[in-house]
Amino acid sequence: MANRLEGKVALVTGGARGIGAATAERLAAEGAHVVCLDIPADEETLNTTVAKIGGAALPMDITDPDAPQKIATYFKEQHGGVDIVVHNAGVTRDKTLANMKEHLWDMVLSINLGAILAIDEVLLGDKIINDGGRIVCLSSIGGIAGNMGQTNYGATKAGLIGYVAAQSGEQAGRGITVNAVAPGFIETRMTAEMPFMIREAGRRMNSLSQGGQPEDVAELIKFLTTPGAVGITGQTIRVCGQSLIGA
């Protein structure tokens, strides 16, 4: 079935590249109007992505204190609301806890978790997310099993697992589903910056013995936003090739 999202409006954070861009493409292919949000420093790449899908760009830092209200105002004024919210934006700043500077801890928690809570508080509180809407958060295998040197990252991704479990019940009355997707090793710019040996180990520590592609994750996210996923909420679903980490 094509155009299962015809008439729907979607927000994808971290939408300039990687999983975010792949998700935006999949949602647009199903008929949704997709608004991609990313930091102003990536505006050129962001514009390229939205031009490809016929969407709209929203250059913004989600950690800015006024970002949630700006997002809410944009969707209320431009579209009367939003149907799909994909919280994809995230970063890593890896250090063992003993060597982690406070600003690195704070940065990861702010982007990966705090900003999501702040945005949803406004979008849900002001009923900008329409009845029957979909919220999908990007968690990680690192939030299920944890990885050495990723205490900050793992804490945020584990936090999202608890967040969707709690929010799903709160939003059920309006027919809004809230789920998370937990990718394993995915071939993105972020993983490409890992040291070679760590990157190769990440690729091979699953039953498929290969890294996943952004499109693999995007396909699941797309499904969770469609009418066929109306019965799925409060869940965290892995896309990891049966990762040996957290098995």
Q: For each predicted feature, which ranges?
A:
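Short C-terminal tail/terminal secondary-structure segment
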Residues: 145-148, 222, 233-247
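Short, small/polar-rich loop/turn modules that mediate ligand/substrate recognition or access, typified
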Residues: 132, 172, 177, 232-234
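Active-site helix of classical SDR
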Residues: 120, 156, 164
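Conserved glycine-rich Rossmann-like NAD(P)H-binding loop of the short-chain dehydrogenase/reductase
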Residues: 30-46
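Substrate-binding pocket helix/loop in short-chain dehydrogenase/reductase
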Residues: 96-97, 104-106, 202
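Residue(s) in the substrate-gating loop at a strand-loop-helix junction
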Residues: 140
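Alpha-helical segment proximal to the catalytic Tyr-Lys
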Residues: 125, 169-170, 230
